[in-house]
């Protein structure tokens, strides 16, 4: 049988958002989530005799559902059940797959009914997933697929989660495998959980070239041999062609589906017929079955559990205002970290999902405000290193039209508000108009000017402790205390067990033009 068309459907960075909601409130309905995205795929694929369904990683962590599974079962089985019944053909690993530790990940991989491909992460002498490249026969055509993951994971992940692993360059791994893939396959698909370090049209760098994203380098060197180049990690929406290669990145949380159709002529020459993003929109034929509704109800009930009542409202109405000046919520976050750690200084980012706390605080509020499974470390740093850290945070700001605004470096190609930290226990002033590295002044701890040669302690999350977000000054800092409590649980414990009637002001900073 001669194949004429093959359709490839891709989701990426779903982050455990199965249901059509982001859980910010109960019983809401939004055009998102794996169930609805899968419905879009199934409706569309009917027109093709041959098709593939692909998950491009970051499926295991990131939503309240994932938090719920960890808290109640310690197993990803319910999440796996959703993926298994949707009949994915293959997937790859994302960087967040490691957040709950290697045993949890390996257990999940054993339960999945489709291959998860990753050719550039090794455990001992073999690839972690035991499968880096796989071939699929479609009619008289062979489709070769390689899975690759960003090599930058050691810069973010807790060392104990990855201590037996080695991470290799995606570029070098692809270069190594392509010759053999070309010998065995008529169609080559690269499934890369990583993104682009340069603009696809101009080739101009869009970020510091750290090796985190190698997509442009791979396309520039190997596009003539690649039919489909699937990407993720940056949560961007991309559907275009790079020379003759289809390039896809389908956003996050199941809000869009990447679709590529390849066609072959009578001489078996392969070409890209279409490359697009399918919007995930409401459909009257979409329903959620009774068993799934029951799972969602259990989750919603858990999220609505009331933890405590605060003395006053800490709602964030405007995120930028809460980043440019002290806010009751970021003050509370830093106070909790200072109390838990005993450090001189603490710092926290205000995450994209954060809305602060109303007076009555529920589990939903805590998880929406601290969605990542970060633990914490107390590091010993010099006053000079502390200043370096605050200077890095000060790079978040820029002056546009004579107003303080967010620097483009923290907005493109992917918003990185999580790489701006707000500090507690130290007062400081940021002068945005000054050159980078010279913006911070008036640093005071407990009423005394910060001595650049003196040693202080700072409580940071594990992502920062290994230099995540270009906070390299922390990488070799001695660890004074390791706090193996995740952010959400730390807040739950603090809210449950402390007198909150008087919360001291620990955040004190100014941002000036």
Predicted regions and their residues:
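Acidic, metal/ion-coordinating pockets
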Residues: 1-283, 324-336, 481-486
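Feature captures C-terminal
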Residues: 5-7, 17, 30-32, 36, ...
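Short, compositionally biased low-complexity segments
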Residues: 8-15, 150-151, 300-313, 363-365, ...
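Glycine- and acidic
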Residues: 20-26, 159, 315-323, 371-375, ...
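A general secondary-structure junction signal
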Residues: 55-57, 349-351, 432
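Short glycine-enriched loops at secondary-structure junctions
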Residues: 59, 149-151, 351-354, 464
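A short C-terminal boundary segment appended to hydrolase-like catalytic domains
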Residues: 264-362, 466, 495-513
